[in-house]
């Protein structure tokens, strides 16, 4: 799923079609993670190739959670490479990146979402088993971006992160916001 509000559209598509939940995937986490990597790369003044970073949560500037605690460059935690202030700046830039681009373009982005979808499709078609944050059904009642192993069957596995207390609070706030949107739009379908 690409259309916004992406998490809710993925959820509604799943509920209205009755398709296997492992095959209904939203690309928001992949897109948001690519933006996070871009901003980290710029802050580090290093190529993206060595970066391992992801965004979980909803695909929205108030619901996404850039997971800076897990981010690494060539296996070195970014917390050892960037100051806390710089990391906070990268996180903020990531969270407003889509809105900033839309404002500059006067329309929604198309290249980065297309690239994110191509990345997902490549992992599915070639059974690459890549770990990609995707919006998938969780607990049978909402969709949210979490790291998933993506292969020929769609979502092969959902990877559970060991979130600290603050990250868990942020994730639960994000879940509540997506649930609210699901409820609002579900009542109109």
Regions flagged by a language model, labelled:
Residues 41-189:
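Long, compositionally biased stretches enriched for glycine and/or charged residues
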Residues 1-37:
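Rossmann-like NAD(P)(H) cofactor-binding subdomain of soluble oxidoreductases
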């Amino acid at each position: 799923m690409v259309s916004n509000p992406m998490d809710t559209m993925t959820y509604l598509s799943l509920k209205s079609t009755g398709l296997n939940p492992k095959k209904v995937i939203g690309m928001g986490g992949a897109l948001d993670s690519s933006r996070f990597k871009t901003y980290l790369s710029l802050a580090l003044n290093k190529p993206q190739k060595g970066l391992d970073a992801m965004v979980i949560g909803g695909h929205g500037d108030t619901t996404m959670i850039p997971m800076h605690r897990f981010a690494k460059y060539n296996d070195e935690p970014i917390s050892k490479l960037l100051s806390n202030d710089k990391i906070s700046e990268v996180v903020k830039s990531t969270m407003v990146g889509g809105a900033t681009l839309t404002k500059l373009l006067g329309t929604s982005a198309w290249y980065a979402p297309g690239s994110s979808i191509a990345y997902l499709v490549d992992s599915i078609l070639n059974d690459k088993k890549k770990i990609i944050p995707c919006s998938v059904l969780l607990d049978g009642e909402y969709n949210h971006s979490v790291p998933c192993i993506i292969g020929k069957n769609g979502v092969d596995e959902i990877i559970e992160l060991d979130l600290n207390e603050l990250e868990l609070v942020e994730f639960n706030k994000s879940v509540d916001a997506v649930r609210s949107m699901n409820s609002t739009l579900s009542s109109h379908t």
